[in-house]
């Protein structure tokens, strides 16, 4: 059985990157919540 985590920076950015978050209303909600909480890093 292969391991489930096969790292790829491209996939990482495309699914969890800033532009991916900004592309949907819910993604923008995620960013707003992380800003409100005071996260040092908003994405990835």
UniProtKB/Swiss-Prot annotation:
Top-rank taxon: Bacteria
Any one of the GO CC terms: ribosome
Biological processes annotated in GO: translation
The entry's keywords: Ribonucleoprotein, Ribosomal protein
GO MF entries: structural constituent of ribosome
HAMAP family from the UniProt entry: Ribosomal_bL34
NCBIfam families: rpmH_bact (TIGR01030)
Protein family (similarity comment): Belongs to the bacterial ribosomal protein bL34 family.
Name of this protein: Large ribosomal subunit protein bL34
Organism: Aeromonas hydrophila subsp. hydrophila (strain ATCC 7966 / DSM 30187 / BCRC 13018 / CCUG 14551 / JCM 1027 / KCTC 2358 / NCIMB 9240 / NCTC 8049)
């Amino acid at each position: 059985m292969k391991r489930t985590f096969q790292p790829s920076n491209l996939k990482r950015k495309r699914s969890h990157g800033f532009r991916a978050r900004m592309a949907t209303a819910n993604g923008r909600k995620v960013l707003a919540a992380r800003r409100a909480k005071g996260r040092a890093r908003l994405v990835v």
